[in-house]
Regions:
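Active-site-proximal cap/loop segments of hydrolase catalytic domains
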Residues: 4-123
Length: 123
């Protein structure tokens, strides 16, 4: 998932690429588009229900998906999940949109993903 809080992000023209992505995501300043965007915005569609185990990853220096979006998304998901499954947040403190650069750093991120998946499957 890329933008977790579509409405807030696309309302902030100071965020890089926002205005260039109106054609793809919609422009919340347009009333009809706002209500359409609300139907697919992950953050705005969290409700009380069972959710699977979730690992959300982000990078502090991601210019395309601001780090505070997943930091806001995860606690709301935890609050509304009725399943008891874990919801984790991993913040990369040095990487950008593509994560850490370098072969070993990238492998560490992949290892985190596989570790999470294998741990959940073994429960």
């Amino acid at each position: 998932m890329c933008i977790r809080d579509s409405l807030t992000t696309m309302s902030d023209e100071s965020i890089p690429l926002t205005t260039f992505e109106y054609d793809e995501w919609g422009n919340p300043a347009n009333k009809d588009e706002y209500f359409y965007m609300k139907t697919y915005s992950p953050y705005d569609n969290i409700k009380n229900q069972n959710y699977p185990a979730v690992l959300v990853t982000t990078s502090l220096y991601d210019s395309q998906v601001q780090y505070y979006e997943p930091a806001k998304y995860v606690p709301k998901l935890r609050e509304h999940s009725t399943s008891g499954n874990p919801v984790f947040l991993s913040i990369n403190l040095v990487g950008g949109h593509g994560g850490k650069s370098g072969r070993l750093e990238s492998l560490n991120e992949t290892a985190l993903d596989y570790s999470f998946l294998l741990n959940i499957l073994n429960q």
